[in-house]
Amino acid sequence: MKRFSILLPLVILIASCDGVLSSTSSLVTTSSEIISLSSSTVSGSTSQLSPIVTIDLYNLNDFHGAVEHNPSNKEIGINRLAGYFKTQLASNPNSIFLSSGDMWQGSADSNITRGRLVVDAMNQMGFSAMAIGNHEFDWTDDYLFLNQTRSDFPLLGINIMTQATNQRAAFADASIMIERSGIQIGIIGTIGASLESTILTSAVAPYDFVPYTNLVKDESQRLKNLGADLIVLLNHDGTVESGVMPYVDAVFNGHTHRREVFHVNGKPVYQGQAYGQAISHVRFAFNTANMVPSFIQNQSGVYTYESLSSSNQFPQEDEEMKALYDTYLVNEINEVKNEVIGEAEEALTRQQLGQFAVDEMLRFAQTVKEDVVASFHNSGGVRATIDQGQVTYGELYKAFPFDNELMIVEVTGTQLLWWLSAGLYQKTVPNLTPVDENQSYWIISINFLTERHLESSSYPHDLDTAINTYQYIREQLKTRWLSEGTIRASDYN
């Protein structure tokens, strides 16, 4: 099979919707230092006059259903995102659009449709592959299977294993091979081997996330045997297993919502923040006239980025995407999302919303069981702030997107002391302390936390006496807001 040398393997870019790229890497330089190739030798396709083919890889990570344009949080939204991708594809037909996971869960727009809207949008934008992230499991594997069937692209997760069979999960592919102008690009997907702990225990119980270095090594070799000229890893984790780097040419990370620009042994490892706030972009150039399968390192050491401001790089909404989104809004979303639930006298921070949540949890718990003495909620379950003024259910949904059920559980005094020292949002009844270690107490928390005790000693409680209220904190806060009308942030400092 014909093989090509990579003439400029690493011209690496990251796009930022706020026009600023923060990086401590000394290898990140300004766009004026981009290596210049004449138009007679660089092309998006192979021709006699243009032996150099450029492949542009664009990756979106941790989108979390941020389909609505939200300039205050630098969220570009799907209409403008589609416009940007369409422009890039017109500029270079060899552009490839990818995702390193956590695409569906996180907004009313996406959650109401269980990710269906985001999948349809990705189909319309022409995504080629997506790694499975931990939050793709939030609605159990039922929706992984449903969204896999709906997707025009594969969901990748080479190290997601079904416990019962020790085989890769049926909804997860190991890789995909993509061809552009005679260049074969192998795409492999992984998820961090420790990320089961970030998922509701019952939702991920049938699966294990195993270490993936050897799996990637073998899959990379298989793809190269099939003719791959380039191997790209989509990795849903903030770090990549070090043993993987000899077997891939570029890595797109996710999960930690950081903006990262660095390299390992000359190979790019990128992450583009979250919510569409940044887009990672890596460019490779191939010399199709060279038949020798060699990897030519870029001796100049020039790495570059371009800042893509939402004001001047995303000026137009894509009309086709707007039509898709508007249809969803009218038919399924607006009636729920736009319900006004009250007022915020001041803006509420995530910390204040967390305290508001445990305040309401304790009040609600005592209507179910009057001797509940404390409430607990994790900080990671509060995902956004709420602005001053009129508050809609959609805003509350974005702050509390997870469908975690409120659980009332019995604990010993010793176990209660563990909860009190766990660093959670918490509220207790007056005069709870000193805690009697030999006495029994009742507390309320969310099942994301209580289910952790099924597999570990953390979040201890009596499993046999637990009471599931089948209520979500989001719904309880909505009811509270509707009842009180106005919520004051200062009440929850």
Residue ranges and their predicted role:
Residues M1-F4, D18:
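Positively charged n-region of N-terminal signal peptides that target proteins for export
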Residues F4-S5, G182, T385, S490:
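Small/flexible residues
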Residues L7-S16:
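Bacterial N-terminal signal peptides
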Residues S16-Q48:
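Bacterial Sec-dependent N-terminal signal peptides
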Residues D18-G19, G101, G189, N431:
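Glycine-centered small-residue hotspots that permit tight backbone geometry or close packing
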Residues L37, G44-E306, Q352-R363, V372-H377, ...:
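Acidic, metal/ion-coordinating pockets
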Residues V53-D56, L60, G65-P71, A82-Y84, ...:
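Catalytic centers of hydrolytic enzymes
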